[in-house]
Amino acid sequence: MINLTVKIAIDGPAGAGKSTVAKKLAKLLGFTYIDTGAMYRAITLKVLRENISLEDEERIVEVARKSDISLDGERVFLDGEDVSEEIRKPIISQKVSVVSQIPEVREILVKKQRKIAEGKNVVMDGRDIGTVVLPDAQFKFFLTASLEERARRRYEELKNKGTEVKYEEVLEEIKKRDSLDSGRKTSPLTIPEGAILIDTTDLTEEEVVERVYEAIRKNTKGEI
């Protein structure tokens, strides 16, 4: 019996398997899944749609402030429109790190993310969940994998969706995202204090979910 809300934070770089593991874990536990990366992608999509320069931080912040982003399971809605597929396009992946490193944008979205998580048992994944968004989360995990494996996964994902892309291009894109994510001034990608580190390079999705689930059960004496 869960008497208080449980927060599970899953962080890690691009292609480490965060979203896949978080979705499966949330389903297994019956928790709400919150994809914070999708929220940054939604803002990026709107910025590109409105032909706003990525250097115009003031207008980008205004977009973040005025946009209505809601999540329903794995579906993402921007101002009432389902943009779940559109935000996964390569052009969004290429630009999202530029938008997400703007401090005011992060501040606005962190508030939205905390509000969504209020009063719920949640599994939230992103790049600053255990450090900034939910620093008091009872469970923190940091997933990682080799650069080559992360690029391979993203390449396969795009290929399966019918997107024409070269592996080398995906590899370069992930290198750039790693650099931006780790080097940004606000909420850089770091391993949260007390987080359980899992290298997913040679593990299947199911094996990672099992490790996370067992760690949670062990620390709650099987109550979850």
Curated annotation (Swiss-Prot):
Enzyme class: transferase
InterPro entries: Cytidylate_kin, Cytidylate_kinase_dom, P-loop_NTPase
GO cellular component labels: cytosol
GO BP field: nucleobase-containing small molecule interconversion; pyrimidine nucleotide metabolic process
Pfam families reported in the protein's UniProt record: Cytidylate_kin
Principal localisation: cytoplasm
Signal sequence residues: none
Catalytic activity: CMP + ATP = CDP + ADP; dCMP + ATP = dCDP + ADP
EC number: 2.7.4.25
Superkingdom of this protein's organism: Bacteria
Positions annotated to bind ATP: G12, P13, A14, G15, A16, G17, K18, S19, T20
Molecular function, one GO term: CMP kinase activity
UniProt KW Ribonucleoprotein keyword: no
Subcellular location: Cytoplasm
Alphabetical UniProt keywords: ATP-binding, Cytoplasm, Kinase, Nucleotide-binding, Transferase
SUPFAM superfamilies: P-loop containing nucleoside triphosphate hydrolases
HAMAP family: Cytidyl_kinase_type1
Family membership: Belongs to the cytidylate kinase family. Type 1 subfamily.
Stored PANTHER family: CYTIDYLATE KINASE (PTHR21299:SF2), CYTIDYLATE KINASE/PANTOATE-BETA-ALANINE LIGASE (PTHR21299)
Protein name: Cytidylate kinase
